[in-house]
Amino acid sequence: MTKKILSLLFFIQFSISYCQQFPISESTKISIITVGLADEVHSLYGHTALRIQDYKLNFDLVYNYGMFDFSTENFVAKFAKGDLQYYAAAYPYADFEYSYREDNRSIYEQVLNLSTLEKQKLFDKLNTSLLPENTFYTYKFIDRNCTTKVIDIVNEVLENKPIVKKNINSSTYREVLFPYANNHFYEQLGINIIFGQKVDNQATTIFLPLDLYDNLKVISYKNKPLVSETNIVFEANRTNPISYLDSIYSLIVVLLLFIIINKKATNIIYFTFLGLIGLLFSFMSIYSFHKELFWNYNILLFNPLFLFLVYFIIKNNTKWIKKISIICLLSLGSYCLYMIGKIHFIIVLPIIITTSIILSRLILKRQN
């Protein structure tokens, strides 16, 4: 690992010194590279990078702003908190392309229609971003990622910051994100219940690779298309097999078991699980720097009060079981009203129905 890091640092230093000594030629091509989707959580939304090729000077580099190190100490905790450091790296484009072909991910190239001077400025800017004081940045899901970094660097060099969202409609960030996790039900569920109010705002910025790809098709710069050429470097042959285990049907089956069995032990397990999730969401809202996690109204569904309910169920405290059940049921009703019209309402509906049935049974049982 150390050897790889040293080699990378050497290459970065070499590329920076190289560009300082040799200006690019008129034949230089600068492209925005869009990588298609994959099945892992961190690759569900694609990837963006910049490519610079100059055959006269004999180099073909990719500038990748989506680098991170899984071996980072406390990686998961830092990612959750929102202070995980991503970094930029430049390396041979051939290696970049090979790795994504191996992963069977589509690769699209959009060549930017720039003057030689603009290309030189962008090239210099890219290499400046590789300096030790600039290369690391704090990742933010919507506001600062591989796509937004590429947009920011290009916009800083070009006049009037031409890369902006053109296809603005009434869609929210959540609605833009939702289809990407189709055929990955539990990832889709997890992503939507952990995100709070911010992702329900109107999506007015470009933050996803394929959205950037689509917008670049219609963006003009100096009265001409910003993209002069689009190439399909590699078209992945991906299948989307249906998995009943990773679907809403498996969730419904599990929830039906809790409804049918209807025992004290199953109620304890059910509400403990929901309550712990709610406790986690509450903690994340306070602990994390990710603004997407703030004001998470899904806490009304995964209510931390369920943990108190579990305690009183264990103690057979009829009075408090009824009181907390009523409070939680009212909270659930408020949640349902708030959720009307939201795209993820349908995927949490089985949990809403199951929780309502079990809470109602507890209330009615105590009344009898």
Which role fits each region the language model picked out?
Residues 1-5, 368:
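Positively charged n-region of N-terminal signal peptides that target proteins for export
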Residues 4-14:
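Sec-dependent N-terminal signal peptides
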Residues 17-21:
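Boundary at the C-terminal end of the N-terminal hydrophobic targeting segment
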Residues 26-104:
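Glycine-rich catalytic cores of cysteine/serine-nucleophile enzymes that process amide/ester linkages
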Residues 69, 73-144, 148-157:
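A cross-kingdom signal targeting lumenal/periplasmic-facing segments of multi-pass membrane
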Residues 128-306, 330-334, 341-368:
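Activation targets extended, charge/polar-rich intrinsically disordered C-terminal tails
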Residues 261-269, 311-323:
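Membrane-helix interface "capping/anchor" motifs
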Residues 314-323, 334-346:
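Membrane-helix boundary connector in multi-pass membrane proteins
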